[in-house]
A protein has these predicted regions:
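C-terminal binding/interaction regions
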Residues: 2-16, 22-30, 35-108
Length: 108
């Protein structure tokens, strides 16, 4: 079933919804970020991963500084319309530390 951006429940969590970013080919989970309506519209329009930075309080495109962009192949919405998956083709590491994925620390 297809959903429109207007059907996403941004109000449930104060205007933001979590975005799981997954490699479309390897299925690796690359990161977890957040999107608001504006950044989701930009992602849909441009085909690049756009998010809302909670720490900087601004829109940002993955790779705008590092060059490690993510080309969106598909956007999936969960059954409650309050979480999203970007299936992407990354051009480099997902993590700002240089690691391939952000989930590289094991909880002890």
């Amino acid at each position: 079933m297809n959903k429109s951006i207007d059907e996403i429940d941004f109000e449930k969590s104060g205007g933001l919804v979590p975005v799981i970013v997954q490699d479309a080919n390897t299925k690796d989970i690359l990161t977890l970020a957040y999107t608001n309506k504006e950044s989701l519209e930009l992602a849909k329009k441009t085909g690049n991963s756009w998010f809302w930075s909670r720490s900087r309080n601004k829109l940002w495109m993955k790779g705008e500084e590092s060059g490690n962009t993510q080309k969106i192949k598909e956007i999936l919405v969960d059954c409650d319309s309050d979480a999203i998956i970007y299936l992407v083709e990354p051009s480099g590491p997902a993590c700002h530390t240089g690691e391939k994925v952000c989930f590289h620390n094991e909880l002890k």
